[in-house]
Regions:
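Active-site neighborhood of phospho(di)ester-bond hydrolases with catalytic His/Asp-centered motifs
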Residues: 3-5, 26-31, 46-53, 66-67, ...
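Active-site-proximal loop/helix segment associated with metal-binding centers of metalloenzymes
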Residues: 75-153
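Active-site charged/polar residues at nucleotide-handling catalytic sites that mediate phosphoryl
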Residues: 21, 120, 165
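Glycine-rich, phosphate-binding/catalytic loops in enzymes
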Residues: 20-21, 42-44, 141-145, 187-189
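Short catalytic/ligand-binding loop motif for oxyanion handling, primarily in non-cytosolic enzymes
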Residues: 10-12, 35-37, 56-58, 72-75, ...
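Binuclear metal-dependent phosphoesterase catalytic core
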Residues: 72-76, 159-164, 176-204
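Core catalytic region of metal-dependent phosphoesterases/phosphodiesterases
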Residues: 2-75, 152-155
Length: 204
């Protein structure tokens, strides 16, 4: 299974990447760009969930949308995912055109997602943003912001998940850097724009 970072409606490059892996499933982990440009026909097995730069309504209507959160198995790889994030640049965007008020899941939806996470205790987690234990490393290493971004309900939910259970792998995007580090037994990986990685079924 291929996991792909933010593409921001760069569909030509996205489809070119998918063509290198015919027959393999893929999951694009948010900031797909739906709502900014017409989405081309996607190959079978190409899935995505939304980030903070996606139109939530259009995403939910698309046949290749995984859903807002849940558990799925593709190519023998089982994973848990959560959509959405908070936009630090929303003051520069236009509501309903380039920014959507429901970019994050609601508190109730996130609470349900945390409950499902606790029940499933997954080995692999895919999210658009990452928990603070990982994003703090990125902020410090790359000096992305002079001040730490404000706490968000998505971030708080991801932190709650991390406190409940440490998965083997956690892959996210949002921060536009390629970064990987093991923290307390979890291999965290941030995918940059059009970054990707392959996740294989674990051998028993």
């Amino acid at each position: 299974m291929i996991v792909i970072g933010d593409i921001h409606a760069e569909y030509t490059q996205y489809l070119k990447l998918l063509s290198r892996y015919p027959g393999q499933s893929s999951v694009q982990i948010g900031d797909f760009g739906i709502g900014f440009r017409q989405v081309p026909e996607l190959p079978e097995g190409a899935w995505f969930f939304r980030g903070n730069h996606d139109n939530p309504e259009l995403a939910r209507e698309h046949p290749h949308y995984l859903g807002d959160y849940g558990v799925r198995e593709l190519d023998g790889v089982k994973f848990f995912w959560v959509s959405g994030a908070w936009s630090i640049d929303q003051q520069y965007r236009t509501e309903g055109v380039s920014w959507w008020r429901d970019e994050e899941l609601s508190y109730a939806e996130l609470e349900q997602a945390v409950d499902l996470y606790e029940k499933e205790r997954p080995d692999l987690v895919l999210t658009h943003d990452g928990p603070n234990v990982a994003t703090d490393f990125i902020l410090n290493r790359y000096s992305l912001h002079k001040t730490k971004p404000i706490p968000t309900r998505t971030g708080q939910a991801l932190d709650a998940m991390w406190s409940i259970h440490h998965p083997k792998k956690w892959i996210f995007g949002h921060w536009h850097v390629n970064w990987k580090q093991e923290i307390e037994g979890t291999e965290f990986r941030c995918l940059g724009e059009l970054g990707w990685c392959e996740v294989n079924k674990e051998k028993k």
